[in-house]
Regions:
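Outer-membrane beta-barrel translocator domains and adjoining extracellular loop/strand segments
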Residues: 42-50, 94-103, 148-153, 181-188
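Repeated loop/turn-to-beta-strand initiation elements of outer-membrane beta-barrel proteins
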Residues: 79-82, 129-132, 161-169, 209
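Residues on the lipid-exposed face of transmembrane beta-strands in outer-membrane beta-barrel proteins
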Residues: 32-34, 70-74, 84, 120-124, ...
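Gram-negative (and chloroplast) outer-membrane scaffold detector with strong preference
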Residues: 73-152
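Short glycine/proline- and aromatic-enriched beta-strand/turn motifs that initiate or cap beta-hairpins
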Residues: 21-73
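Extracellular calcium-associated, cysteine-rich motifs in secreted modular proteins
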Residues: 205-254
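Residues that define the transmembrane beta-barrel architecture of outer-membrane proteins
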Residues: 26, 64-68, 112-118, 132, ...
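Outer-membrane beta-barrel "beta-signal"
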Residues: 29-31, 193-213
Length: 254
């Protein structure tokens, strides 16, 4: 675990030094932080019971006290991006089905079972460009809980709160429908459907600005010479409103 935390810290430092806003200019983003696994959704049969304790962190959420997920995404176009997520956890709180369908849902520790997942996703930021940046996502993956393993179909919601154009806080909830939905949900061999929540920092990067004038190379008419935005990145040394490349006397206003 110590080595994993060091790896995440190194990634954080590297990305933090080179990050920009994710869009067609800066298409890459990396997120990392903590995740929580909640098994109540498959223990309950009624929708109201499945979501009634959505925020019951103390009783239902399994959380590792360390960085426990990493996500990398690539912007495609029109708010769409695709990515991959890897996560680890420990299952210490397992919500059991009700005996005979009545009574309370009990929570037991099945034995500190290990949890691993690897998932792919397609994400749509439906109102991009704002400080509050919500999105929906769908995808699929594979989950391991102790001796059990199976594929899942995933879907959920998320939102990123941008502190700056390159750093934000991302919150996400994902429902994972298990292909191994055994009636008894018995661990350690079964992998029941569950919710997985994520909270972490997001850094965006990937843009190229060779001359450092704040205009990305793909939009810069003079990508190797620092210039002005109003001239598409070309310089006007003498400030006479004529770019140097078209100015017969570029150092004398005329």
């Amino acid at each position: 675990m110590k080595h994993l935390n060091k790896l995440f810290a190194a990634v954080c430092i590297f990305v933090g030094l080179s990050s920009q806003a994710q869009d067609s200019n800066n298409p890459w983003a990396i997120s990392f932080g903590a995740n929580a696994v909640d098994t109540r959704v498959s223990a309950a049969t009624k929708v109201e019971d499945q979501i009634s304790q959505y925020f019951n962190v103390e009783d239902n959420w399994n959380i590792l006290p360390s960085i426990s997920y990493i996500n990398v995404t690539r912007h495609i176009s029109n708010g769409f991006s695709f990515g991959v997520t890897g996560s680890i956890n420990k299952i210490k709180k397992f919500v059991n089905t009700r005996e005979g369908g009545v009574g309370e849902y009990t929570v037991t520790n099945p034995g500190d079972f290990s949890y691993y997942s690897a998932d792919g996703l397609i994400k749509w930021n439906f109102i991009p460009g704002y400080i509050v940046d919500p999105y929906v996502h769908v995808g699929g993956g594979y989950t391991w809980i102790e001796d059990g393993n199976t594929g899942t179909v995933n879907g959920g919601l998320g939102v990123t709160f941008w502190f700056s154009e390159m750093v934000g806080l991302t919150l996400q909830s994902t429902y994972k429908q298990s292909f191994d939905e055994r009636a008894d949900r018995a661990l350690p061999n079964a992998v029941p459907s569950h919710l997985q929540h994520f909270a972490g920092l997001t850094f965006k990067f990937g843009g190229k600005d060779t001359d450092g004038d704040g205009i990305y190379d793909k939009d810069d008419a003079c990508p190797e010479v620092a210039g002005l935005k109003q001239f598409n990145g070309c310089p006007d040394t003498d400030g006479d409103g004529i770019i140097d490349g078209s100015d017969a006397c570029p150092e004398v206003a005329g």
